[in-house]
């Protein structure tokens, strides 16, 4: 957590979009990396540790800032976006972009829940995890068949304290040093495992469609990361709904980490 996630969480709390991925072949422990064996103690995964970090910071700064946190949980299954917290999978969710109010890329129709504690977030995560698509393959008895994104928007507003009001209202021509409102989107993404057709045993039917969709979206993600690292002018975010959704949290001044899980 200290090496791959802490910097991203601190950035999100200061107004920088961020994304953390768990990537690897199916059965390598990506979901365990994210959630861990327990929500307390040393067995915590990245998400419980991140939530501890976030809400401890919110509490520590409660005299200076008002925080508004909203959580969503979505899966991308065969290139279909599905709400894991209100699982009416017949409902169409659409990726939109708001340039007028500065929301950036968002999912129209996706549920969003105001959260004020780690326990509230974990309860929603449990609900979403139960609705996530899993299936047995030759490589994993509980293989995730979708990419799942835990999404947390963090808005921070300065309290109207006397000191802040004085800074905002100075008439001496000095730069305004009052705290500003910040907004950031944090994505923690459990990617479905990459698979080979022969080793997974999914040569036909729905499992094959899932595998093909998983591998295509992972390929699109790899292409975007490669283009960003090479500073190319065109980044192919629109090649997959996965990369389109994460567009604001991959490019620009966003912070991104990739945790790669491998079998020993």
Sequence positions of predicted segments:
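Microtubule-binding structural modules
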Residues: 1-264
